[in-house]
Amino acid sequence: MSRVCELTGVSVQSGHNVSHSQRKTKRKFLPNLQNVSLFSDSLKKAFKFKVVARAIRTLDKVGGLDCYLLSASDKILSKFAIEVKKIIKNNGSKSS
């Protein structure tokens, strides 16, 4: 099970716990991943994604799943998100 956000690409980071005596021990910073169903307005359908809490806030700010996917770069999106993006693009071109 991979700990990567499907919409933003945020993943596990590594660092140190630092004690009072300045000893450093390795640790991991885990992303705040949530399993959510996101609704596509153009397709009238919900899709399940594993996303970080910050991405959910960004989706609300941008105006929904469709707007976010169309403006996002394919480099940061997962394979499933890219497929959904293509479906949304094709659906938009048919309705125009």
From Swiss-Prot:
One GO cellular component term noted in the UniProt record for this chain: cytosolic large ribosomal subunit
Gene3D superfamilies reported for this sequence: Ribosomal protein L28/L24 (2.30.170.40)
Gene Ontology molecular function: structural constituent of ribosome
Gene Ontology biological process terms, A to Z: translation
HAMAP family reported for this sequence: Ribosomal_bL28
InterPro entries: Ribosomal_bL28, Ribosomal_bL28/bL31-like_sf, Ribosomal_bL28_bact-type, Ribosomal_bL28_sf
Lineage of the organism: Bacteria, Pseudomonadati, Pseudomonadota, Alphaproteobacteria, Rickettsiales
Keywords assigned by UniProt, alphabetized: Ribonucleoprotein, Ribosomal protein
Annotated protein name in UniProt: Large ribosomal subunit protein bL28
Family (UniProt): Belongs to the bacterial ribosomal protein bL28 family.
Gene name linked to the record: rpmB
